[in-house]
Amino acid sequence: MKNQSNLAESTVIAPEVVSKKTNFFTKFKTSYGPGILAVLTWLGAGDLVTSSVAGADYGYSLMWILALSLILRFLIVNVIARFQLCNTEGLTILEGYGRIHPFFGYFMFGYALIMGHLFNAYMIKGAGEVLSTLFQVNQPFLASLVVVGLVFMLIGRNIYNRIESVMKVLLALLTIAFLFLAIQATPDVGQIIKGTVGFSIPSDTGVHGALLVAISIIGAVAGSISNFVHPYFMKEKGWTKPSHVKVQRNDLLFAIGVCIVINLAIWVVGAEILKPNGIHVETIDDLAMALQMSLGKFGWYIFYLGVFGVLFASVVGKSTGFPRLIVDAFYVINKNRREKYNGKYEKDPMFKWVMIFVLVTPLIWSIPGMPGFIALTIGVNAINIIGFPVIAIGMLVLSNKKSLMGKYKNNWFENIILTLASVLAIWSAVQLATTFF
């Protein structure tokens, strides 16, 4: 509102000039907000690690998994967002799930609580390791404590506008750094295309098994419960009506486009720089080697500052987004509590306690002797796939309810894709179970 007021005052002086400025700046600002937040909530260590490990260990042979996962992410998040904007009763996505069967409310509450803890576990661990390396103190656990303390200082202080601006800068820096390195590496386009349409799982040749890496990519990209955080950022932006469907879709396309560029650049770095040099990504320092080999100490700083920025921003995003998701799921179970606080999470003491849980308890994974950052990241994103079948099947049912969606219910193409997503989810979960048990 403040921006609109300022522009209105300026119009009196130079209407033609301001009109052009308003069209450009206002359109950009209002079109690309939640998508930026979504990218950083999605991105973080999951994409960074899975793409680099896949590239360094298996070249481009698993590229088709990434392509499929990004397509599924767009379609799933678009359906989730459309439900939030267009359902006839003004339900949140989790309230919609609760309408299908009470099981969904209990499942989503427990699943979101566990995954909120686990996602922040490797994000905080990674941010602590990077901060420790930057300051050369060799105390990653203490650095993780500092990260959590800094996040506490940010939360609740006009957080959306501040974080959005910071995230745009960090995302741009990270993208430019990896994109520059990927272009410099002169990627083999033929191999990229071959890997994108290959549809095969290579034999295990890396530190981490090919099937585990593939499932981890699906979990990190397509099957992430972080996809459910997007509607809460939309609400903060003021996108709450069917009239916002188009701008939401454009915003989401922009977000997915950024994801494609970043993931592809990271993958190319792994395949063209790390793999030929026999470097397997077992620690975050192994990934830093790519920039250091090409850009020297400057590249080293760019990598660690950029990665710290993304990890830190992701911790903030998850620590504010997941509590909304968790409390919303609990409101599906306990409708009286929703009515008591009029559906306003921030007024509910539970929201604060859940935020503390999601932010503080993951520190146990940063204690010396716990699994390494890379292994933890791959493991958590693989485990994330367990909830994907429930999410995909529930979404397929919910988005076809004409009583709720009217003319905005799924078209035939979306139904085919969601059905395939459900099949992929069940296959991935079964494969993961047989791998471990």
Feature map (PLM): residue ranges:
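Juxtamembrane transmembrane-helix boundary signature
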Residues: 38, 65-98, 107-115, 119, ...
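Transmembrane-helix boundary/entry motifs in multi-pass membrane transporters
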Residues: 21-24, 28, 59, 85-114, ...
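Extracellular/periplasmic helix-exit of transmembrane alpha-helices
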Residues: 74-86, 234-235, 257-286
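Transmembrane alpha-helical segments of multi-pass small-molecule transport proteins
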Residues: 109, 134-156, 172-179, 344-364, ...
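Hydrophobic alpha-helical segments and their helix-loop junctions in multi-pass secondary transporters
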Residues: 172-203, 211-216, 220-232, 392-403, ...
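Flexible loop linkers connecting adjacent transmembrane helices
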Residues: 10-17, 50-55, 78-101, 129-132, ...
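Membrane-interface loop-to-helix entry segments
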Residues: 146, 154-187, 381-388, 410-415, ...
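Hydrophobic transmembrane alpha-helices that form the core helical bundles
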Residues: 104-136, 311-329, 372-378, 426
